[in-house]
Amino acid sequence: MTAKHLACTAMRAIRTGLVSTAIFQLAVGSSFANGQTATPPSRDNDTATPIKHVIVIIGENRTFDHIFATYVPVKGETVNNLLSEGIIKADGTPGPNFPKAEQKAASDTPPDAFLLSPTTSSLPGSVLPAPINGGPTDSYVKNDSLSLAKQSENGLPADYYAYLVTGGSGLTGKVPDTRIKNVNALPPGPFQLTNGDTFTYNSYAASPVHRFYQMWQQLDCDVSHATASNPSGCDAALFPWVETTVGAGTNGLAQPATFSTEYSPSATITGEGSTSMGFYNVQNGDAPYFKYLADHYAMSDNFHQSVDGGTGANHIMFGHGDAIWFSDGKGNPATPPHNVTVAAGTANAGVVDEVENPNPAAKTNNWYTEDGYGGGSFGAKSYGGGSYTNCSDTTQPGVAPITKYLASLPNPIAPNCEAGHYYLMNNYNPGYFGNGNNAYTDTNANNTVFTIPPSSVPSIGDDLIKNHVSWKYYGDQWNNYVPDPYQLNFNAIGKLTDEYCNICNPFQYDTSIMGNATVRAAHIQDTENLYSDIKAGTLPAVSIVKPSGLVDGHPSSSKLDLFEGFTKKIVDEVKKNPTLWKDTAIFITEDEGGGFYDSGYVQPLDYFGDGTRIPLIVVSPYTKAGHIAHDYADHVSILKFIEANWGVETVSTRSRDNYPNPIATADNPYVPVNSPAIDDLMSLFTFSYQ
C-alpha cells in the first residue's frame, strides 16, 4: 500500500453502565409514529455457530508465498506453496520445478494498446533485475529512542518495541540491496530475502508496485496458458517486467530520457528492480509468531486479495463487497476530471487526468500513458492521477483486453460494471475526514484534489445496523487523526504522531456512516477503545481492526515482525478474558499481496479481481491445530461468514457475497468448478472439536 504512505507523507497525511453498545448504536434513527424512540433488540447472540464475536485484523501487503513459502504443515494436512510445488527447496534455493515460476521479459509498444498478456522472452542473461533497497537507513524513530517509540504506538507487547528502533538498511538512495546475497545474479524466479547474514527478518525491506492494471498485467492471464490445475491461465510470469517498465505509475509524465529497466548510477529507474520476487523462510525462523499460529490454530492456503492492486480498493471491497465509483456526492454517477483544471484559484490548482490509461506512451515499452496516485496537491500544483475506469465501455483504455479475456474463459465471467460508472481502481483519499466534514469539497491547501466524493454504495456496516448486530471499526491512532484531518503530524514521532490510515477505513468513504455524528461516534473508534472493550468484555459482535502505519507490516514503512507484535497483543488480551475467548474467532489477514509474487491459483470473479493469494489465519477455540483449508476465498468471504453466522442478508444485489460457495473436485480442491464462487470460511472451523 505504498500510496497510503506517499499520500500521508505528502499531507503533513464504550459501552457504559447497563446500556449496551448494541442498544445505543441501533436505537439511533428508529422511532414510533408518536415520536418515542424504540430500542431494537440486539441480535448479537443470535448466531448459527458458537461464535459470538468476530475480530478481523488487517495488515499490509504480503502474499501467502511471501510469508509461508517453506511452511510444512502438521501431520495429516497439506499445503500449496513454493516448497510443496518443488519450486524451491527448504533452504530457499531453486528446486527441481523452479521453471514453473520463471519470470519473463515482454514487449508492449505502440501502436499496440495495453496488453494483458504480451509476447514474452527470457530475461536478459536469465537473471532477475537487481532488487532495489527500501526503508530507512537507520529507523523511523529519532535517535532510535525506545521512549519515543512507546509514545508513538500503543499496539505492541513490551518486548516488540525494540523492533521499532532497529532494522534499518544501512544503505542510501535507490541502489541494489546488497544485503541480499548474490543480489546482481539472482536466478529468474523467487528468491529468499534472508539468504545471507546481513538481511535479517527484522530488516526493513523494499515495497513493489501494487496498482490495478499493473497487477492484471503481472498475472499474465490468457486462456492459452490454461491447464487442468490452472484453468484461468494466469501464469504470473511478468512481475519484475511490470515493476521495471512502469512501476507505481507515471502521472501522465513523459518517460525520462535516461530511463532504464536495469540499475546504473546514471540511469532513471522505477526504484524497484525485482523486489516482487522476495520471500521469507519460516523454517529458518522468519515470521515465528505467524508460524506458531498456523501450527496451533487454522489457516487457509487459498485466500485472495479481492481486487487487483492496492490498499484503498481492497479495503473498499472488503467493507462493501463491491467497488465504489465517482459521483456527484449525492449518489448519482458522474465523470471524474479528465484533462481539466481543478481547484482553480487555489494553491492546488492544476490540470489533472483522473481517468486511467494504461496504453503505452509513444516510443516506450509499457510506460503507461496516464496512471498514478496523483502529483502535487497539498499546497502544490496538481497533475496526473489516473485511477478511475469506466469498465462498462470497451472503448475506454485498458477495458477491452480484460473484458475479452473474461469472456473467453470456459465459464465466461461478467465484468459487473454498471453503465456510466467510473470505478475507483487505486488509492484516493476518502470523501470524509474523521470529524465528518466533506473532504472532497474542502479547499484547504493542505488537502488533496485526489479525493473521491462521498459514496452511497451500501456496506456491511449498514447491513449490520439494519439487522441489529453491533460492530465497530477500530483504527489505530484515530484519536490523533480526528483533530488532524490533513495529517500534518504524520511522521511526527511522539505522542501526537498521526499514522492512522484513512484510505483503509471502508466506512470513511460512506455518507451513511460518516454523515451522522452519532453513528460515526458509535462505530468508528481508536484501538485504545479496542483494548478497553476486550478487558471489560464489552466487545461488539463484529470488530474490524487496523494498525497504524508504524506497525501494519507494510514493506519499507513497516516490517512484518511489527505486524506480528500488533496481532499478538490482541490475541493475548482476548485470551486473558476467558468469557470472551470461549466464543471468539480472530481473523488475521492482509489487505493485499503488495505486489509480491505468489504461485497460487487466481480465479477471475469480475473486472476488479481476484488478485494474488494472501495469508488468512483464524485463531479460535473452535479451530483444529494446524488445519489448512483449501476452499477458494477472498476478503468478501469474511462478509459471507458474518452474514451466515448472524443470519444477515447480502450487502446488495450486486455485491460479491451473492456468489455461491465453491464446489471443487477431490483431485483439485483449489479450483471451483462453479466459478465465480467464494467460500464462507466455515471449513476453517471444527465446531464439534471444542
Question: Residue ranges of each PLM-predicted region?
Answer:
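N-terminal secretory signal peptides that target proteins for export/translocation
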Residues: M1-R12
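Non-Sec secretion/translocation targeting segments of pathogen effectors
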Residues: M1-T2, L26, S30-F32
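Bacterial N-terminal signal peptides
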Residues: A13-G29
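N-terminal pro-sequences and low-complexity stem/linker regions of secreted or lumenal proteins
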Residues: A33-Q690
